[in-house]
Amino acid sequence: MTTGFLQKIFGSRNQRLVKQYQKTVAAINALEPQIEKLTDDQLRGKTDEFRQRIAAGESLDKLLPEAFAVCREASRRVLKMRHFDVQLIGGMVLHYGKIAEMRTGEGKTLVATLPVYLNALAGRGVHVVTVNDYLAQRDAEWMARLYNFLGLSVGINLSGMEHDQKQQAYAADITYGTNNEFGFDYLRDNMVYETDARVQRALNFAVVDEVDSILIDEARTPLIISGQAEDHTELYVRMNALPPLLERQIGEEKADGTGVEKPGDYTLDEKSRQVFLTESGHEKAERLLAEWGLIGEGESLYAPQNITLMHHVYAALRAHTLFHKDQHYVVQNGEVVIVDEFTGRLMAGRRWSDGLHQAVEAKEHVKIQSENQTLASITFQNYFRMYAKLAGMTGTADTEAYEFNEIYGLETVVIPTNRPPKRIDKQDQIYKTAKERYDAVIRDIRECYERGQPVLVGTTSIENSELLSHLLTQAGLPHEVLNAKQHEREAAIVAEAGRPKRITIATNMAGRGTDIVLGGNAEKQAAFLEADDSIPPDEKARRIKQLHDEWETLHEQVKAAGGLHIIGTERHESRRIDNQLRGRAGRQGDPGSSRFYLSLDDPLLRIFAGDRVRSIMDRLKMPEGEAIEAGIVTRSIESAQRKVEARNFDIRKQLLEYDDVSNDQRKVIYQQRNELLEAHDITETISAMRHGVITEVVHQFVPAGSIEEQWDVPELEEVLRNDWQLDLAIQEMVNESSSITAEEILEAVTSAADEQYEAKVAMVGRESFSAFERSVMLQTVDRLWREHLAALDHLRQGIHLRGYAQKNPKQEYKREAFELFAAMLDAIKQEVTRIVMNVQVQSPEQLEEAAEQIEEQGGHLENVEFQHADYAESGAPVANVAVAAAATADMVGSAMTHGGAGGEMPKVGRNDPCPCGSGKKYKQCHGKLS
């Protein structure tokens, strides 16, 4: 109450910020008359002047009014568009590292030019991030005219570009690209073997378009670079036969044994998207698997040797019960392609993790792609937090303002519209069944069609859009369908969705980023005419004028009919997605309207609010086909949406807390890697490693401060000879001296190791040996980091079970992840020392060849894929991540000869028998983490 009273007096934080920025707007406007008088060359010359002033120490904040005034004037001359005052405010919000919420049609693309121009003057690079390649290319080509006029270079970073093209794109003052591509480039840069193979510069300033889509909707979906792992194709096919033989249990058993309406083999929790086998389901699955020869007679699925099978059983069950064709995925060209649940777009190249994608492929009888091992991964949350300054813009951010602030430290500022909005948002209409709802939607569309009003219908899935399309065809209403299957045509369809009598069905926010102009998009048609050289100039000018005249007539006609009418056929889990759909109407003060038609069969209502609304309808004795339209019901639905939003926020926050652990470790490894790449000589690093490892080996058999009776000298001699190529007569030293200490033995072994090392260096030269050491170290770091990522994935998969032991899973994860990381660092030291001490050197040429071979094997991994894999959608616990497969083979081995034996050192996998002949697995013997 007190807060509301103070806000009335002083205004909200948002109002105060906007008022503060309006003072700067006045200063920019005051500069306009003198800037207008400048010639094109003088205006362009301002860029060099600003750069000199920045070099002399002037801050960007102080330059802001002049730079914005110059950018606005350049835009007026080049693009024939002058920034409105509210757009200047939006530009300031972005420059100060905040999120600007601007309504659809308010010119976000143009707003971005102001802070991008100002920050590019510093010469440290600016990244403009969009959601897809089409928007990146469109915006870059459109705005490059302005930036080039002002003397700035523009690059476009697209997937599939050549390495040299990418380096040029990043070297430009301003780089446009997609969130995926920027993230993958960061990961790839940390897998290279030469400094000049990197493409990115330091992460300076990023402006993220559709910031809610990238930083919130996709925050649960890490970017993963993966390589091929073990093949379980046959097992997925066998397991696919299991789910159809199991029946779903209806109802949940309570403590008193009641609650089960119909017994079955598994339960389905739609709210948390989980599936669980019941007791009878386990028994039935075990019996069937035994019949198929996959487990022994009477064996349990929980037996250690059957844990992998358990994983496949659940993957198959989830594929059959939780993931549906044309809703969660489509089958295209013999491949299962994920449909993004937020945008309805096809996510080509993205795969579900944890074996789920392979299980869906088996279900759809298409070719099963091999499982992958994670080579590198990062979430958008952690990638974008690395930028020195981050800003974003969207039409709908205010509902998620708390999350932006909590996770990214970004404040959201709602920018006033240039003209007052005229859109009318009508009350939701709720029907008992989906059939009644669709009948009402068709009636509404027909009424709009008859009065010449364009309609945009939003659906939540491809399945629903195709059903509605079928109903419209039956009703004889011409329409366009815009879903993930027509990805290429979406911009063209959206551009014309504002023409009279036009009916467009869109899956969620497909076509986002393209304005719907009332009367159609005359500019696009005029651009086609301009580009056609076969038309004479006079004829071209006449046709373009005719186009604009026709558009004026159509524009007024549509405005008179009520503007664009938005129909939502379902409420989304997030209010923000609903607001995005509504926001397509009423751009720049145009008239418009919106209404949502719901049914009690909708997932959101069924799961969260169905019983309450159904009881209201029953009490009111609503006849069939009659809708309930009341504020209390709409509020009940919004309350359900808030619950889902809060749950999704908790999921993202929890994922971030887990990912922060691996992120801290990633930073350490990548920093070490970069130091290695940039160092000319790593002799000191190798020397410190060698001394550390030798000390550990000696102390294992001759403990520090111990007496002679506790020593195992013969075993020490054997280990030094076999593993480290050091042939020392330590037993003789002990026999000859009555007072020798453990420290003296350590000193003797260390000296021998140093002498052996120096002899190798002397044979080939410091430079050649240093290059070899760098290659070995980089390859070892990369290989063990990959194994470590796999170990972390395994750890995270089961860590939630620690809660049953009254332990905090997050704390347990942090503790064990740290122990694994420390063990990995030890393993790096051991492995590098072992290779360097075992290598037999004959000539510098041979050493260079070995180094090149190591780099080639490490840098050119086979079957590398770039995935944007959705962990959270796999239906696994929140703590779960993709299970990476077994460790890769030792790639260093084939690049050098083994000391003593003179032949090739064998490749040893972690699960292979140890070459020392102990009979143990390599990972439990000489490959063991110490």
From Swiss-Prot:
GO cellular component: cell envelope Sec protein transport complex; cytosol; plasma membrane
Ligand binding (ATP): Q87, G105, E106, G107, K108, T109, D515
Catalytic activity as recorded in UniProt: ATP + H2O + cellular proteinSide 1 = ADP + phosphate + cellular proteinSide 2
Source superkingdom: Bacteria
Textual note on the cofactor: May bind 1 zinc ion per subunit.
Location within or outside the cell: Cell inner membrane; Cytoplasm
Cofactor (UniProt): Zn(2+)
Short name of one Pfam family: P-loop_SecA
Positions of Zn(2+) binding: C914, C916, C925, H926
GO biological process: intracellular protein transmembrane transport; protein import; protein targeting; protein transport by the Sec complex
Single GO term (MF): ATP binding
Key words of the record: ATP-binding, Cell inner membrane, Cell membrane, Cytoplasm, Membrane, Metal-binding, Nucleotide-binding, Protein transport, Translocase, Translocation, Transport, Zinc
Enzyme nomenclature, EC number: 7.4.2.8
Membrane protein topology class: Peripheral membrane protein
Quaternary data: Monomer and homodimer. Part of the essential Sec protein translocation apparatus which comprises SecA, SecYEG and auxiliary proteins SecDF-YajC and YidC.
Family: Belongs to the SecA family.
Function comment: Part of the Sec protein translocase complex. Interacts with the SecYEG preprotein conducting channel. Has a central role in coupling the hydrolysis of ATP to the transfer of proteins into and across the cell membrane, serving both as a receptor for the preprotein-SecB complex and as an ATP-driven molecular motor driving the stepwise translocation of polypeptide chains across the membrane.
Protein name, entry field: Protein translocase subunit SecA
Native organism: Burkholderia vietnamiensis (strain G4 / LMG 22486)
Gene name of the record: secA
